[in-house]
Amino acid sequence: LWLWPYLFFIEAVPIRKVQDDTKTLIKTIVTRINDISHTQSVSSKQRVTGLDFIPGLHPVLSLSKMDQTLAIYQQILTSLPSRNVIQISNDLENLRDLLHLLASSKSCPLPQARGLETLASLGGVLEASLLLHRGGSPEQAAGVS
């Protein structure tokens, strides 16, 4: 109860700041993934060149689908033996928090997706990602005819 007076003085974070922080964090994650792939002799076919579910690149995907995809990737990262991926996993958690903040700002709060529950849909996410990399349309990747 003693916190209530302080809560009235807290200003809302401008949505533009949240969007900018989201973009910066995405760039940081991609850079960290690329750094790992350079230091651990990963094949160029396996290298990450970007994240297809970034808002703005493929507006067909919903915020909840993006959150689900991030939860899947986070689950995969936490199961890898490398210590280098711990920070990336933490970054993904922060990115998911920003995504939830963006959704709340649009009055559509997201349910918390859980990695283990969403891991079953990994095949669909990977297929959509591969289709987009091969030049398919976002509609095809989303399964819309």
UniProtKB/Swiss-Prot annotation:
One of its GO terms (molecular function) is peptide hormone receptor binding. GO terms for cellular component: extracellular space. The gene is LEP. It comes from Equus caballus. This is Leptin. Residues 1-12 form the signal peptide. GO terms for biological process: activation of protein kinase C activity; bone growth; cellular response to leptin stimulus; energy reserve metabolic process; intestinal absorption; leptin-mediated signaling pathway; lipid metabolic process; negative regulation of appetite by leptin-mediated signaling pathway. InterPro entries: 4_helix_cytokine-like_core, Leptin. Belongs to the leptin family. Key player in the regulation of energy balance and body weight control. Once released into the circulation, has central and peripheral effects by binding LEPR, found in many tissues, which results in the activation of several major signaling pathways. In the hypothalamus, acts as an appetite-regulating factor that induces a decrease in food intake and an increase in energy consumption by inducing anorexinogenic factors and suppressing orexigenic neuropeptides, also regulates bone mass and secretion of hypothalamo-pituitary-adrenal hormones.
